[in-house]
């Protein structure tokens, strides 16, 4: 631990000098508030910065404060989030905003323990908010920081082990500069995202830590950090139906819990159905095929699941299943349909 600490103590000065020259210009950094920092950090979980930018702007226009977010209708919330994925993040944001209004009198919590009571706020997000928005010397340790720290110190410990993450947080707490804690944490984020890249692609020649980085000196960048092998994804095959009738398309709302909870989807069947089986499946649900227009295939990756989808675009007649809604174009624009069905949505809209 002492050797690791000695190396990391050399990091703040060159890292902050590098950050001052290379920092990313991002809207939540140009106008800092606890609320904006929180929303941006939640959006950035599992999502690239460039993908987040337009969503952040729209979200701030629709819900510029915790009070506005607490009152935002769920349908509007999910529509704003459509395409970002991991929709539980959006629901947790609203739940947390309601907690801020009800339990904290509308005042954003400024302590670690209080922040951790908010839905969806973990150790990293709490550290980011406290350091960036409140200037408190609290580390924010995510995958980028774990990678940077493992390479600088030469650690061969498994970074997916919670004990290793906790140890890294302890080390960073010992070296974070009290005069610029937010900049230090954001500099680490930028370094990990743009220079100390995963795999064999780090740009060591551009890194302010290269002179004292163990991995750079020993050529072990490809080996660090050590991670357990990911669990193989379960694969599920689906047949998706884009059913057209009188200018409307059939949609159904998913269950309130579980994967893609409460979002809207096209009717679909488990497995891959040929036209005969598909027509029978539809007939059981009260619709008859008038014309088969097109077949479409797509796939979508979730964290532990892969969907392989075969789809039919077709014109039908009949009422359909009780939980189906026949939505015209204007209504469809108001509903949150997950990006997993993006290819089918383009077909439904004639794009």
PLM regions and their residue ranges:
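Catalytic cores of DNA base-excision repair glycosylases
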Residues: 2-205, 209-218, 286-287
